[in-house]
């Protein structure tokens, strides 16, 4: 499955033209810049939202199909009782970042990592190596305690098996 197809499925659109019409874009059926800008948040699992006068976490969460808890997690340095019009918030969507039913690619892995880091800012990322093709080998970390556990996935020849198991596990752990 292509990334565009995943984003369209998450948007509930049958094809690009339907999505473009719904978004008020010219329905060309092509992956143009404006269309991809609107589809990208659906892949990342969150959107950047500019606060408007009268907004509350509850109103924003309800309008976007998410929870106040998810917004609090994604915006740890924001005071939910002091929203200032014009400031930006990360608003997680009400679905998991990590798709459970699509084949993983290096590109999809990096998109999932980006989304997880924003939705769960207590996670951190480090590039520990590069593949022969120059792609990053990413390590994700949660917590800072004295105990350490390593879970390994997305390594050569097994990424299609291990990544779809480990990443949803990490997302469930982070959201707990």
Task: Go through each PLM region and give its residues.
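M14 metallocarboxypeptidase catalytic domain recognition
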Residues: 2, 10-14, 18-176
């Amino acid at each position: 499955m292509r990334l565009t197809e995943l984003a369209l499925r998450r948007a509930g659109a049958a094809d690009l033209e339907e999505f473009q019409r719904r978004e008020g874009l010219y329905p060309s059926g092509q992956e143009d810049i404006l269309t991809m800008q609107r589809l990208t948040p659906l892949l990342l699992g969150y959107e950047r939202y500019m606060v408007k006068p009268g907004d509350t976490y509850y109103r924003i969460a309800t309008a976007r199909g998410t929870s106040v808890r998810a917004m609090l997690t994604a915006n740890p340095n924001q005071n939910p009782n002091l929203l200032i019009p014009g400031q930006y918030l990360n608003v997680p969507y009400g679905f998991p970042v990590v798709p459970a039913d699509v084949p993983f690619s290096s590109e999809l892995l990096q998109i999932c990592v980006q989304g997880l880091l924003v939705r769960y800012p207590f996670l951190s990322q480090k590039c520990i190596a590069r593949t022969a093709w120059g792609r990053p080998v990413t390590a994700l970390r949660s917590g800072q305690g004295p105990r350490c556990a390593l879970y390994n996935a997305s390594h050569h020849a097994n990424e299609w098996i291990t990544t779809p198991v480990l990443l949803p596990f990490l997302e469930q752990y982070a959201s707990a």
